[in-house]
Amino acid sequence: MTLLDLGWNDAFEAEFATYRELGWEPARLLRDNKISYGALVGDGEEYEAILSGKVYHEAETDADLPAVGDWVALDITEDDVVIRARLQRQSCFSRKTPGKSAEEQVIAANVDVVVVVTDAGTDFSLHRMERYFTLIHRSGARPVVMVNKSDLFTAAENKLAAEQIQALNPEAEVMITSVIKGTGLKALRSLLKRGVTLTLIGSSGVGKSALVNRLLGDEYQWTGEVNEVTGKGRHTTTARELMILPKGGILIDNPGIKEVQMWTDETTLRDSFRDLEELSMQCKFADCKHGSDTGCAVRGAVERQELSPARYESFLKLEDEIEGLRKLCRKRQMTLERRAKRDHKIKARNRSDREAHEFQLRPRKDREIH
């Protein structure tokens, strides 16, 4: 095994030059264990590494901290293994942290391909798929969708699901598969080349763990059963993990995702909804909100049944969500600035008090102020 097998490239090598002079080694993070990280170096040796205080305190947000898939600089000694720096990410798939906080959650760093696993049954949701496509577009990775468990549905149902997903994003590669039967996986395997990083996302119970087992060639994970009543599966992946596949390629597996919350901007959203963006160029007003505005070409297309009402409503909903996110981020930034200003005042006051105290402790002859 070499660094190239782990996804190393010339850009990482150039950035790492200064760290190499310090005697540190490049490593890719396999796992985040909360208090430590699993890290793999070029010769295949795995280390349990801790984060240096400098890296921790220089991170402005949790998203700036190392995550699974990141490249880091390891300081390896007899006593411990310390992460001294994180290299710049070349791509990053992330979402807004669930809840009301304005925080980014990194799902996988430095990924080339994001594979969304779904099925033609209870998990099928075009609205959720639109969210996935928007986040994948922002990440810079290649979008791939697996309509899995084809053995449980008719050919017509699988074909319809695949066609509807393809219509949302003509650039995405959509494949109909059955991991259990081993059908439809040839196209996916062709993506798994040396140094290429692929991450799996999707709901619980859609077959991600079974796919990992098949790609690794053994029963790597326990695979949960799906409730026949609800159609939902139990989580079989409890933490994100990066794995080097036997036949080449790198796989980052993720626990089932329940909430696909936006972490992006309006520009990325419009790029993901190119059909609406092209229509908006025909609107009467440049700042048309595509609501009740006069001369809205987008709403006109909906009325003429040239644009799906569901897609139109989905766009408006995501636009509102992104606007809400922007307000949350602005509010959070103001809070951080106030906190920083307060901390600065406290430090200044403490320094002044300390200097005054030291002045009082000096011998009287040294207290004269010149």
PLM regions and their residue ranges:
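Beta-strand/loop nucleic-acid-binding surfaces
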Residues: 46-65
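Short boundary/loop segments of OB/S1/cold-shock single-stranded nucleic-acid-binding domains
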Residues: 1-25
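SH3/SH3-like beta-barrel fold
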Residues: 37-42, 49, 74, 83
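Structural detector for short beta-strands of small beta-barrel domains
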Residues: 23-35
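Conserved Switch II/interswitch segment of TRAFAC-class P-loop GTPases
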Residues: 77-94, 110-130, 144, 151-156, ...
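Canonical P-loop GTPase G-domain recognition
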Residues: 142, 151-206
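Helix-rich effector regions associated with P-loop NTPase G domains
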Residues: 2-3, 20, 42, 60-71, ...
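A conserved segment at the C-terminal end of the G1
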Residues: 208-224
